[in-house]
Amino acid sequence: GRRGGVAEMRFAFRWDMSLPPQEFYKEANWDFVMCVAMILLYTRERWIEPMYLPKLPYSLLYHQTMSWLSSQGSVKPQELARYILTLGVFRHVSKEDYLLLLRHMLENGQIERGEDGALLVGDKGEAAVNNYEFLAVFSVPSEYSVRCNAEEIGTVQTPFPEKAQFALAGQAWEVTELDLKERRIFVKHIPGISANMWQDTGNEYVHTKVMKKIQEVLRSDEEYAFLDEAAKKRLNDIRRACRNAALSTSSVISERIADSAPGFPGGKVVQITPTLYTVFPFLGTRACMALMYELRQRGFGANVWLHRYIPVCIEVKTDRSLAELETALSEIKLHGADKYTFRIPDNCEISGKYNDYIPRELLRKQYVEDYLDAEDMQRNL
């Protein structure tokens, strides 16, 4: 705002209305709805999404270990652990896990053991520490070439795994092969538009309170004063589409729509095809991921469908009946889930600048601990 005037902030959203018809949830611009929800949370409840502090920041642990060794020259293992593990950010890291990391670093030449038993930066570690980018904790984005046959379509900064779908150059693509060494992603064209599949960097979290407010916005008929006429119309269109699918009302039941099962008050199960259902639990990222894995544990082919980084729903591909899916959701609500028993794919990890120097066992442990929240899932399902 000008001096003496009222400050004003405007949010603009672009949506291509000429896209071909798709499932109702793929036609909604959820970032717009989430923006409405977050404005309401702040203006009416004075609530903003809290920062999530990871419990097991192993990439940062590597960085601080190398920084300390570089500054000290050589340090006894006990002294190193005593200093590093007393830093507040590492209070959840066990001595056993730190010992595992140090052994891995020794095996890979990042650090070496001196004649007196002290640890010092190794030959390979010197290359990392002396690089000017080492001063930055965060990674410098890498570009991956996206190719369809022999033609380069463009570049992305995310190494999408095989079968992942994403949008680029105005079209949708599915990954057929990933070459990390050459930084190439081979794809095939698919119809429609795509949002990234459930595998992502693990760094973008949406809070469950935000998702519940999104559900509230969809259920409401209120016209918000901060929306202009075009935005009001767009929100009403999205509300109407969701209600037609029985997503946001509890009284609509048809042959294609399943109302909430007993003990499952969170959202709706919508049958898209005879073998495809969508579950709308309105859970935050970490809770929604936990629900996806628990459904997989129970034999359902589940994937979180993301709009950008917003966990809109879980797509369930199965030959099993709607009643079986509803029963499973009711049981999950009643009994919860043990995230430490989930079968996590080997390529799943929370992105970190120094993940290449971290044992796979620790990266998996970090993913389970910091990217899955079974308690929040059960509490808010």
Predicted regions and their residues:
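Conserved segment of the helicase C-terminal RecA-like domain
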Residues: 1-53
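Terminal, basic amphipathic appendages of nucleotide-handling enzymes
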Residues: 4-8, 12, 129, 141, ...
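Short amphipathic alpha-helix segments
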Residues: 249-260, 280-302
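C-terminal accessory/connector segments of nucleic-acid motor ATPases
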Residues: 46-161, 165-172, 177-178, 271-281, ...
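A generic structural motif
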Residues: 10-12, 119, 183-188, 277-280, 301-323, 338-344
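Amphipathic alpha-helical transducer elements in NTP-driven molecular machines
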Residues: 3-6, 29-36, 59-62, 77, ...
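Short, conserved charged micro-motifs
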Residues: 286-292, 319-328
